[in-house]
C-alpha cells in the first residue's frame, strides 16, 4: 500500500489501472481525469491535464507515510466540494502530538515481484523508495510539528522494438553521419534511460490558541523528473536523443485558521499559494531539428531532438477559501 490507488482499490466503486506514474483512478465508471484530488482540502490536480493519473505530479502527489486518512466523497451536499464528476478524494496529513514519534522506511521492487500481463513478462526495472517522518511538540499542548521527506528512483530500459538485422546497418549510417557531419550524438534506439526520480518534502505546524481556536501552516514541495517517449518506440526506431525530460516542481504554502466564533457560528479560512513549474527538454538538446527518416525496409527512424515537446510552463496560483 504505497500509492493513493493502492488504498482506493479496496473500494469496489473505484477501478484502478496501471502503476507508478501510469496509474489511472476511475470512480463509478467515469473518466480517470474527472476526479478532484485535494490535500488537506487544497486542490492538487494536474493543471494541464497531461498526466494520466490526474495528479499535479508524475508519481504520488504526496507520500502515503505522511497521511492520517483518505476521505472519499461521490455526491457530497456541500458548497466546499466540487469540480469533479467522479469522486472527491481528500488526503489528510498527520500532525504532531505531545509525544515524539518518528519512522525511517525504505522499500524496493523489480520485475521479479510483478506478475505477467496477458502472458507476457514484464520488462526489467527497479524501483526504490526511502524516507522518514518525525513529529512532536514544540510547546506541550500548544505548538506541534510534523515533517516528512521521501525520495524515489526508478530504473528501466527504453521501450524499444528489437532492431532487425537488415535495418541495423542503415541505423549505424545515420548515427555516424550525424556525428561526423554535425558533431551530433544521436544515441541509439536501445539504451538505458536516465532514472526517473521524485523528492517530496512536507512541513506542518499546528498551534492551538485555545480550546476554540487554532491555526495551521503547511509547506509541501514535490519535484519529479521523468523521461518520456514520443513517436512510439515500440513501433519505430526512436533514438535516445528523441526522448524528452518531463520535470515537475510544485511548491505549496498553506495557512489555515479554524475556530468557533460562538455556540452557533464556526469559521474556517485558508490561504494557499501554489507555484507549478514544468520545463520540458529533449535529451538531444534544443539546437537540432526534428527528423523522420524512412529506411529501405519501410521502417522509420527518429534520430534527433523531439522539438515539439520543448516548453517552459510556470503557473502561480494563490487561492483563498473562507468557509
Give the positions of each predicted feature:
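Transmembrane beta-barrel wall of Gram-negative outer-membrane proteins
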Residues: 101, 123-225, 246-267
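Outer-membrane beta-barrel channels and translocator barrels
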Residues: 32, 67, 94-96, 139-141, ...
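Outer-membrane beta-barrel domain signature
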Residues: 76-80, 119-121, 190-193, 242-244
Amino acid at each position: 500500500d504505497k500509492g493513493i490507488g493502492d488504498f482506493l482499490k479496496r473500494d469496489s466503486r473505484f477501478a484502478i489501472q496501471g502503476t507508478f506514474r501510469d496509474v489511472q483512478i476511475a470512480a463509478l465508471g467515469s473518466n480517470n481525469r474527472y476526479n478532484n484530488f485535494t490535500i488537506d482540502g487544497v486542490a492538487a490536480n494536474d493543471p494541464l491535464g497531461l498526466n494520466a493519473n490526474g495528479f499535479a505530479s508524475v508519481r504520488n502527489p504526496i507520500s502515503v507515510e505522511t497521511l492520517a486518512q483518505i476521505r472519499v466523497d461521490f455526491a457530497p451536499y456541500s458548497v466546499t466540494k466540487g469540480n469533479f464528476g467522479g469522486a472527491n478524494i481528500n488526503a489528510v496529513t498527520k500532525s504532531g502530538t505531545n509525544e515524539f514519534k518518528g519512522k525511517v522506511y525504505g522499500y524496493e521492487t523489480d520485475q521479479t515481484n510483478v506478475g505477467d500481463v496477458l502472458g507476457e513478462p514484464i520488462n526489467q526495472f527497479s524501483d526504490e523508495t526511502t524516507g522518514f517522518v518525525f513529529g512532536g511538540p514544540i510547546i506541550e499542548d500548544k505548538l506541534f510539528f510534523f515533517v516528512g521527506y521521501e525520495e524515489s528512483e526508478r530504473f528501466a530500459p527504453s521501450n524499444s522494438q528489437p532492431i532487425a538485422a537488415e535495418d541495423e546497418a542503415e541505423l549505424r549510417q545515420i548515427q555516424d553521419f550525424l556525428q561526423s557531419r554535425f558533431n551530433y550524438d544521436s544515441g541509439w534506439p536501445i539504451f538505458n534511460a536516465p532514472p526517473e526520480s521524485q523528492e517530496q518534502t512536507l512541513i506542518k505546524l499546528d498551534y492551538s490558541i485555545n480550546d476554540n481556536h487554532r491555526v495551521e501552516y503547511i509547506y509541501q514541495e514535490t519535484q519529479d523528473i521523468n523521461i518520456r517517449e514520443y513517436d512510439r518506440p515500440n513501433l519505430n526506431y526512436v533514438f535516445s536523443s528523441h526522448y524528452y525530460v518531463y520535470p515537475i516542481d510544485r511548491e505549496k504554502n498553506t495557512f489555515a485558521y479554524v475556530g468557533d466564533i460562538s455556540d452557533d457560528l464556526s469559521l474556517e479560512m485558508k490561504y494557499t499559494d501554489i507555484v507549478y513549474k514544468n520545463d520540458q527538454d529533449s535529451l538531444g538538446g534544443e539546437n537540432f531539428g526534428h527528423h523522420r527518416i524512412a529506411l529501405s525496409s519501410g521502417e522509420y527512424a527518429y534520430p534527433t531532438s523531439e522539438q515539439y515537446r520543448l516548453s517552459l510552463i510556470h503557473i502561480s496560483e494563490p487561492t483563498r477559501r473562507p468557509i
